[in-house]
Every structure is written in C-alpha cells, then in structure tokens.
Amino acid sequence: MLFDLIGENNILMKHLKTIVFALLVVLVASNWSCADARVRNRVHRNNRPRMAAVVVGAERTGEYLKLLKGKRIALLSNQTGVVGAKHDKHTLDLMLEKGLNVTTIFSPEHGFRGKADAGEHVSSSVDEKTGIPIASLYEGKSRMPSKETMDRFDVIVTDIQDVGLRFYTYYITMVNMMDAAAAYDKEFVVFDRPNPNGMTVDGPILDMNLKSGVGWLPITTVHGMTMGEIALMTNGEGWLNSGKKVKLTVIPCKNYTHKTRYQLPVAPSPNLPNMLSIYLYPSTCYFEGTPVSLGRGTDWPFQVYGHPDMKGYNFSFTPKSRPGAKTPPQMDKLCHGVDLHNLKAEDVIAQGMNLEYVIDAYRNLNIGDKFFTSFFDKLAGRTYIREMIQAGKSASEIRAMWQDDVAKFKKQRRPYLLYPE
C-alpha cells in the first residue's frame, strides 16, 4: 500500500513538472514577443516621416547674397519679417549681419513695429536699433515714396507676412512699391512667405470700378497666393499702373505647398492675434462696412459679432479702447450677438468665405439700407453681394454667383504659382 502511494506521487510530480515547464515556456515566449513588438513599434515611430519645416525666403541667404552684395538696399517690412528657429531675429538684422548695405526701411500699414490702428497715420522715423531711416508709406495721402527717398537705394527688398485676402493691404503696398521701382528703374526682390489661407480660393473677382485702398487688383477675395506669386502675376499680367514691368526676383520658400497649414509666428496686425481670427477674416471682415462690431476692442477681434440692438442672443461683449483699436465701433456699448471664437479651425476653413454671419446680422437688425455703408461694396468687390442680401437671398445663392470667377482666376493664376496646389 505504501509503495503504491509513493508510485502515484512520483507520477503526479512528473506531470506537475511538465505543466510548470510548459507554462514557463509560454511566459518567456510571450514576454519575448511583447518586447520584440515594443522594439518594432519604437523603430517604426523613429522612422515615421516628419514634415520638413518651412524655410521662408529671408532665411535662404545663399539664394540672394550674391544678388544684393554691393547694392544699396531699401527694405519694405514690418514686425512679421522674422527669421530663425525661434523667430526672434528680424530680417533687417540678418541682412546687416551678412554685410548687406540697407540704407532705407519702408513701413506699411500699422507701421514697422505693427502697433498702429488700421489706416492710422504713421510718421516717418528712425529705427532705434540700427539708426536706419524709416520712410512710412502711411504718413500722408500718397502711398508712393518721394524721388529724394528713391535716390537712396538701388534695389527694394520686400519681406512681409500676408494673409491672402484682397482687402488686406500689405500686397497693395508691395504693388505700389513695384510701380515706384519700375518708374525709377530699381530692382525688386521678394523674400517670400507662406500664405496661411493659401489652401483657399473664394469670392468674386474685383470689379475694377470699385478699386480702392482695400481692393487693388482684379483677383478673387481669397486669392490663395503668396506675396511672391502676387508679384509675379502683377508683373506678368501688366497690372502695374505705369504699364511697365519691374526687374523682379522672388526668393521662394522651401518645403511649402498651398495645402500646408502654416502657423504664423507673429501676429500680422493688431487685430489678427491668432490663427482662428485669420481663418475667419474672409467672412467677418464684411462687418467693417456695417454698424455691427466684429470684436475690435475685445480679446476676440474678427471672432465675434454683435450690436446693441441685436436681439435673441445669449452672448454679449463690450468693445473698449485698447492698443490697435483706439476707437472701435460700438465702443463702450454692450453688444449682443454671436461668439465664434470656439469654432474649430478645420470647420472654418471648410466653410470658405461664409456670408451667413452678415446675413444673420442684417436680418436681425432689420434696418434696411442703413445696414450697409459705402465701404461694404469696396470690401465685397461687387455690388451684387449687397443687393442679393437686401433681396433676401441665401448665402448659398450668393456663393453660386462667383463660382465662374473662381474657376477663371484659378486658371489665370496657374502660370505664376511657385508651389504645388
């Protein structure tokens, strides 16, 4: 009996050892497989292709130093002309470090430091850091420099961040300077920068009978082009007032396409403080031609809209005087309206130029023709937008009117594009 029990125990022990061994094999194999998977995943992540950083034209010194060496240079720029990984150096400083002879600075709307209100008079001055004279192009009625100023240099270099709208004035300043360069036989160079709205072409082509300081060329409202491309098209299409062509060189960006979602390192103007304001700008800027506040004097310019007499809204705001918006529309008045500043950027981009906001305010205020100022048609570039809103048409019906313009402009601009669409 005793020997039978011992025999049975030995058999059980053998089976137990076999089971334990099998479990150990499975456990080790499992751990090895997991470790191998972790290694594979780590290698995969490390090898994942990364989008190369955009290099702006000003940073590509090898492309322009030979062109500019030994010449007297006028730089048309503002606070957006920054370079470097940290965006903490101005193009002016880089040019001086490289031994280039910058004799004059031209400043556009908002001034060289970008602090002035829209359209505000900006006096000529001297750059405190370098001692180089700054000639303001927003000092008087004329946007053209004097002969005395033009005699100070041989070549004009432009480095300004645009946002891709027909009514955003930086491209107009550039085109005026191209006219001056052509008239005085000066070279013209553009250090190109990405267009944050470069993925979009929308709106009607400007009726040139409505040409103004917020609409200068026969282009769509949202043109989707960089400053360099606009310069090439202006030259190529014969759009300069003189009818002449300027000796033009564009230093293009690197690693950029028109589908690139480029984040601006510096606000292009005081009331476009973030990317959402830039994406909403094509839609909400029309309120500049109405009594409705678009948020100037608040933390959300171009990202809210309202009026003291608008009714039925839960959101309200009060515009206040502040730097960059000294006397905003409806200042110190409680405005009722719509908050757009929490919208997703992707949704705003997908909508394109959206007239629903203006139509909503027009119908809510119900003041008829008093809703529109003469400035509205200049912004719109066509009278039919105002007329169709007054006639009760929908945003989609109005949008259908400019689709032929969009197709025409896309075809016309194609030879001048520097970057893939």
Functional labels for PLM-detected ranges:
Residues 254-331:
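Glycine-rich, aromatic-lined ligand/substrate-binding cores of catalytic
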